[in-house]
């Protein structure tokens, strides 16, 4: 790495910055996962408490309208809406996410409220599991970053194998034709 920067200091500075970035990213990821989980729990409370706004047709509450405002302040809100929609679709819940009054609303049939609540419960649990898997992957990346000698060793073995191949070492071990009995 010294050749990239002229001396070892530049390489060490880059490594330091990458470690800081990985740590900051891991902290931001954990914070966002925690916030998402808490907000999903809050939305579940709204569903379970019957506080979703009912929309009546012919005097009968047919649809419920649930504010997604709690989720809107999270990073990658558009992705979160897609995740919610995908989870509801997988549960065969007919729904729509509609914009309105400065916030998005989840529109679903009142009779599907238990399935909607269950979908949000599953998302709440899956958020923690996904955060754990992401932390593991970040740790793996950090380990690979801290162990460049393993990569250098593999590169050296590949160079040796390439040299051996180009020098013809082992070329006489190719497939041979075996003659069968004469007829």
Predicted segments, located by residue:
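Positively charged, small/polar-rich N-terminal and surface patches that mediate targeting and assembly
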Residues: 1-91, 98-183
């Amino acid at each position: 790495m010294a050749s990239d920067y002229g001396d070892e200091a530049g390489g060490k500075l880059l490594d330091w910055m990458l470690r800081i970035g990985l740590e900051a990213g891991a902290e931001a990821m954990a914070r966002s996962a925690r916030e998402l989980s808490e907000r999903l729990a809050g939305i579940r409370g709204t569903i379970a408490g019957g506080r979703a706004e009912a929309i009546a047709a012919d005097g009968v509450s047919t649809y419920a309208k649930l504010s997604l405002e709690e989720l809107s302040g999270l990073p990658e809100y558009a992705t979160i809406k897609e995740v919610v929609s995908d989870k509801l679709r997988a549960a065969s819940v007919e729904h729509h996410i509609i914009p309105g009054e400065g916030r998005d609303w989840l529109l679903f049939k009142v009779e599907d409220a238990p399935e909607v609540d269950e979908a949000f419960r599953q998302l709440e649990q899956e958020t923690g599991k996904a955060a754990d898997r992401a932390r593991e992957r970040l740790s793996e990346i950090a380990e690979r970053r801290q162990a460049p000698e393993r990569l250098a060793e593999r590169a050296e073995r590949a160079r040796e194998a390439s040299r051996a191949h180009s020098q013809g070492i082992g070329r006489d071990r190719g497939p041979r034709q075996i003659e069968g009995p004469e007829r």
